[in-house]
A protein has these predicted regions:
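Loop/turn elements at helix/coil->beta-strand transitions in domains of secreted/extracellular proteins
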Residues: 12-17, 41-46, 73-74
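Structural microenvironment flanking redox-active thiols in thiol-disulfide oxidoreductases
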Residues: 1-38
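Short, solvent-exposed loop/turn and secondary-structure capping segments
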Residues: 29-31, 59-60, 88-91
Length: 122
């Protein structure tokens, strides 16, 4: 959804994409993550394997995930261009997920609107 609603329609080089693969399902491993790169083939995308889930847990602390979850996975963030990354990730300007059916459930059009808003404020 993010690929076709956002990346295929927003061609700006101001958009930077970081795809973090983390082991959640039993079949998740580094090889599966390598194969999954095809899911986000955009040239602006950089792919990372979060083997120990440390980034997923750090990102999970920046927002309130549904159902008391602590690990951010199937979560999509928009960060302001001025966001500073240090020992802990910054708070996102906007985010959505695919973890539950609530007001932050991923909606490609809404997410695209927030990406466009973010690149206009740069």
């Amino acid at each position: 959804m993010v690929q076709n609603k956002v990346l295929d329609s927003v061609k700006s080089d101001r958009v930077k994409v970081y795809v973090v693969w983390t082991p959640v399902l039993s079949e998740d491993d580094g090889k599966a993550a390598d194969n999954a790169v095809e899911a986000v083939p955009d040239d602006r995308a950089m792919h990372f394997w979060d083997d120990d889930k440390s980034l997923g847990f750090s990102l999970g602390k920046t927002v309130t995930l549904p159902r008391g979850r602590k690990l951010a996975w199937d979560v999509y963030f928009v960060f302001d261009a001025k966001a500073e990354w240090g020992d802990a990730p910054p708070t996102p300007a906007f985010w959505m997920h695919q973890l539950a059916d609530d007001e932050r459930k991923l909606d490609g059009e809404k997410f695209k609107d927030q990406v466009l808003k973010a690149i206009k404020t740069r």
